[in-house]
C-alpha cells in the first residue's frame, strides 16, 4: 500500500484548498436561492460526544492523563475514564471470565475515573456492562511505548480498543515512543485531531454489530514535539520488526516514501494504521 501524508489527520493543504475554492464558488452561485433554514442547518454544531478513555498502563499513568486533559478542552466532549487499576502492559486482548470489579479513582490530574481490577479489555467491558455507558468512541492510550507492526497483538492498549470495536463502537489506540521523556502532549494532540476529523460521523455512532478494524496511531519522540506529520500506511510484517525500530527517530530525515509503519516512524512521522479487530 502506498502511504498517504496527512496534516492533522486530513489530506494535504493543497487538496483542501482546491475543495474549499470549489465550495465557495458553488455557494456564491446559490446565494438567495437556498431555503431559509438551510444556513441554520449547515451551521448547526454536531452533538456532543461521549468518549470512553482507557489504557493498559493504569488509571494513574501520565499518558492517559495527557489524553483526558486534551479531550476535555473541548466542552462538547463528555470524557469518561475507565481503566485498569494497575499496569497491564502486554495483556493483549485478555479478559477475566465473568468480568472484573471496579471502583472510584482519579487520574494523575485529579479527574474522576473508574479503576477496574483486571485487564484493559475488562475495563471496556465494565464501562459497557456495569456502567451501561453508550460511548460514541473509545480512545485507548496514550501508551508508554510504540505498538508497531505485529506488536499490536500483544498490546493491551490495542486490546482495549479492539474490545470497544467488538461492541460496535469506533476505536482508536494511541501510543507514544519509549524514551526517558515520552512526548505525551503530541500523542494526546493527535488523538484529539483524530476525534475532531471524524466528529460528525462519531456523533451518529450506535453500538451494534462488531466492527472489523480500529485505527492505531504511533508517535515518535521528536524535539519540541515537531513530528514531521502523520503518515497513513500499513503495519510492518512480523520477522525482524523489533530490531528495525530505532530507539531515536530521525526527525530531521527528508525521506517521504515508506513501505510500512516502522519505516515512517523511524523517519520522524507519526503513523496511522488500520488494525483488524481480531488478532492474527
Could you tell me what each predicted segment is?
Residues 54-57, 82-87, 116-119, 140-144, ...:
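Active-site-proximal beta-strand/loop segments in catalytic clefts of secreted hydrolases
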Residues 185-280:
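Electrostatically charged, flexible surface regions
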Residues 50, 136-137:
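Structural motif
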Residues 165-187:
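Glycine-rich phosphate/pyrophosphate-binding loops
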Residues 153-159:
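Charged helix-capping and loop-helix junction motifs
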Residues 62-66, 70, 119-126, 159, ...:
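Extracytoplasmic/secreted proteins, especially bacterial periplasmic and envelope-associated proteins
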Residues 2-41:
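Secretory targeting and sorting signals
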Residues 46-47, 69-123, 134:
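A cross-family phosphate/adenosyl-ligand binding-site feature
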Amino acid at each position: 500500500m502506498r502511504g498517504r501524508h496527512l496534516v492533522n489527520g486530513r489530506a494535504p493543504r493543497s487538496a483542501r484548498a482546491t475543495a474549499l475554492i470549489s465550495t465557495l464558488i458553488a455557494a456564491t452561485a446559490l446565494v438567495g436561492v437556498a431555503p431559509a433554514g438551510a444556513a441554520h442547518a449547515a451551521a448547526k454544531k454536531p452533538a456532543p460526544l461521549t468518549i470512553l478513555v482507557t489504557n493498559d498502563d493504569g488509571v494513574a499513568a501520565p499518558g492517559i492523563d495527557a489524553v483526558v486533559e486534551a479531550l476535555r478542552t473541548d466542552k462538547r466532549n463528555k470524557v469518561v475514564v475507565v481503566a485498569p487499576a494497575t499496569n497491564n502492559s502486554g495483556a493483549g486482548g485478555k479478559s477475566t471470565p465473568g468480568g472484573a470489579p471496579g471502583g472510584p479513582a482519579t487520574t494523575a490530574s485529579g479527574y474522576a475515573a473508574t479503576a477496574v481490577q483486571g485487564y484493559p479489555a475488562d475495563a471496556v467491558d465494565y464501562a459497557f456492562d456495569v456502567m451501561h455507558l453508550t460511548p460514541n468512541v473509545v480512545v485507548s492510550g496514550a501508551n508508554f511505548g510504540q505498538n508497531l507492526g505485529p506488536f499490536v497483538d500483544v498490546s493491551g492498549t490495542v486490546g482495549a480498543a479492539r474490545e470497544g470495536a467488538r461492541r460496535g463502537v469506533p476505536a482508536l489506540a494511541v501510543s507514544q515512543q519509549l524514551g526517558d521523556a515520552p512526548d505525551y502532549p503530541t500523542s494526546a494532540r493527535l488523538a484529539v485531531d483524530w476525534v475532531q476529523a471524524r466528529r460528525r460521523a462519531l456523533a451518529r455512532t450506535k453500538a451494534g454489530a462488531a466492527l472489523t478494524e480500529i485505527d492505531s496511531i504511533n508517535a515518535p519522540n521528536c524535539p519540541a514535539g515537531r513530528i514531521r506529520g502523520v503518515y497513513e500506511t500499513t503495519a510492518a510484517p512480523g520477522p525482524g520488526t523489533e530490531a528495525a525500530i530505532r530507539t531515536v527517530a530521525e526527525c530531521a530525515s527528508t525521506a517521504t516514501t515508506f513501505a510500512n509503519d516502522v519505516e515512517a516512524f523511524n523517519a520522524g512521522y507519526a503513523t496511522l494504521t488500520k488494525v483488524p479487530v481480531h488478532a492474527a
